[in-house]
A protein has these predicted regions:
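Active-site-flanking beta-strand signature of metal-NTP-handling nucleotidyl enzymes
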Residues: 2-9, 52
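Short acidic/polar alpha-helix capping motifs at helix-coil junctions
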Residues: 3, 16-17, 29
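Short beta-strand-to-loop capping motifs
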Residues: 8-12, 55-59
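Short, surface-exposed ligand-recognition loops at beta-strand->loop->(often short) alpha-helix junctions
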Residues: 10-21
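An amphipathic, aromatic/His-enriched active-site/gating alpha helix that lines ligand/cofactor pockets
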Residues: 21-38, 56-94
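Short, solvent-exposed loop/turn elements at beta->coil junctions and helix N-caps
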Residues: 40-43
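Short acidic/glycine-enriched loop/turn segments that link adjacent beta-strands
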Residues: 46-49
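Short, low-order "capping/linker" segments at domain edges
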Residues: 92-103
Length: 103
């Protein structure tokens, strides 16, 4: 069963374009390491400083492998650097879920 990972970002509302670019960098990277990216969700109505992302890996162990490998991958390092340079988000929190479906 796939392990969903939910990210909640606190954004700098003046840097939504930069954050959108940052998010788009991660789609191929998550998939490169065996995950499925389900999208970034940017502010539309309501709070203008919160964004969400959802992706999943076949297991928590595979997610942990992705995390370790991302710290040595040139494209991942470039994405981390972009976020650091643009300061497009202030903070984020990561939560793991288990899906529940109807019987």
């Amino acid at each position: 069963m796939w392990s969903p990972v939910f990210l909640r970002y606190v954004l700098d509302p003046s840097k939504l374009k930069e954050f959108e670019h940052y998010g788009k960098l991660w789609f191929p990277l998550v998939e490169k390491f065996g995950g499925k990216h389900h999208g970034y969700f940017l502010p539309s109505e309501g709070a203008s400083n919160i964004a969400l992302a959802l992706f999943s890996f076949p297991s928590l162990a595979e997610y942990e492998q992705y995390r370790q490998k991302s710290f040595n991958d040139p494209a991942c390092l470039a994405a981390f650097k972009y976020a650091e340079e643009t300061k497009c988000f202030i903070s984020y929190e990561r939560t793991f879920f288990r899906p529940v479906f109807s019987a």
